[in-house]
Every structure is written in C-alpha cells, then in structure tokens.
C-alpha cells in the first residue's frame, strides 16, 4: 500500500505488499521489497535498496546506494525471515549496508533514533544501535555488536563480533575493538585501549561538573588504581550509590561477556 501523499519516482520499483507512509519520497532507481514498511516523511534519495522484512520509521534520510535489509553474510543463514528495524530521524549516508538478523542472534538487526551512519559504514547481522550514535566513514560493526546511546565510532574502525560499547563512548579512527568498552571512555588503537573519560562529550550533553568528577573517579578505580576488575567493582558500586551517574559502569559490568579493554 502506497499512501496517496507519497512520491515514487517512475524509475523506482516498489513491490506489491510494501507499506509506504504519508509524505515518503522514493527517488530514482530505488528498489523497495514486498515486506518493507517505510514510515511517514522518510526520504530515499536514489539507487537505494530496501529488502527483506524491514521496518523503517519516520523522517529518515537514506542516501544513494545504501542497502538495507539484505541477506546477511553469516554462512549459517538459510533464508529465514529475519528482520531489520530502524527508528526515526536517522541519516544513513551513501553506500551504508545494514544486514538482516540471524535466527541464532535473535533474528533482528536494530537501529534506534537520531543516528548518523556516514559513507560506507557497515552494520552486520544482529547488531543493536541505541540513539544518537555516529558511525564515521568506513566504520564496521561485526555481527551481534551492541552500541548504547551517544556512541561515536571513528572512521575505518572495526568492532569485533559480540562486543558491547557503553554509552557516551568515543572510539578513535583506524582502531580495532576486540573487547567491551565501558561507558564514558575514550578508546583508540589496535587493539583499542582506554585513554581517559570523554569529558567534552559529557559537557556537551549537560553533565554537571560534579557528575563528571564522579565518573572520572570511577574510571580511575577501574584503570588507574592497579586493582583488578573484581577488586574495583565493589568500590565503583559504592561510588554509584552516592552518584547515580556512575551506575552505568555497574550495569555494564553485568552485561560484559568479552572482557573489558585494558
């Protein structure tokens, strides 16, 4: 079903069964599959392919040669009807690829709201992106990677399968991330190592001086005290009881499966 207010260029192909919302713009030479839903106000510039069981929210901008919902690159994939879900107000730039999930990974690749995926970024099967993340040019997320909110991944950086990247993390360009990155941390290198707290990012997002100081103290306990992770955990939990902004560290420790960058 195509809403009467939507525009579909004469050279675009929209397969029967696709749901195209109000004021959607589908530019020249785009291809939209039968099991695709595109929300109100979203724009496909030109030469965009949206395939598979894919749901795209409102007011997204998707640029030339992006490919969304295509068959993933997991050799175990056998054609199951797995999905891609994309939220609202995302900017997906030229040649970005977002692959559908796998049965083994829960069947869903999910992108939240207000994200920017720059040219040639790749989001593999079963990845989860939160809100307001940035993937710079040629950033690559392997399968099952999870990014919390406000994560920045620098250009030409690769993130290993199953890694978890905490909120407000900034990973520098040309890095290789092979383990989990706790929230608020700046990381860089191959393999990525911690380089301090993302203070500028926290200031821009309205964190108070007191909150930033507490986060820095938690970082020092984790990385500068000489303590093992197991020794640092209870002290960070005690700090979180006094400063709620530190709680994401505690929550992150419970989620981490690949170990923390050191």
Swiss-Prot record:
GO molecular function: acyl-[acyl-carrier-protein]-UDP-N-acetylglucosamine O-acyltransferase activity
InterPro entries hit by this protein: Acetyltransf_C, Acetyltransf_C_sf, Hexapep, Hexapep_transf_CS, Lipid_A_LpxA, Trimer_LpxA-like_sf
SUPFAM superfamilies named among the record's database cross-references: Trimeric LpxA-like enzymes
Cell compartments where the protein resides: Cytoplasm
PROSITE patterns in UniProt: HEXAPEP_TRANSFERASES
Gene Ontology annotations of biological process type: lipid A biosynthetic process
Catalysed conversion reaction: a (3R)-hydroxyacyl-[ACP] + UDP-N-acetyl-alpha-D-glucosamine = a UDP-3-O-[(3R)-3-hydroxyacyl]-N-acetyl-alpha-D-glucosamine + holo-[ACP]
HAMAP family: LpxA (MF_00387)
Name of this chain's protein: Acyl-[acyl-carrier-protein]--UDP-N-acetylglucosamine O-acyltransferase
Species assigned in the record: Klebsiella pneumoniae subsp. pneumoniae (strain ATCC 700721 / MGH 78578)
Protein encoded by which gene: lpxA
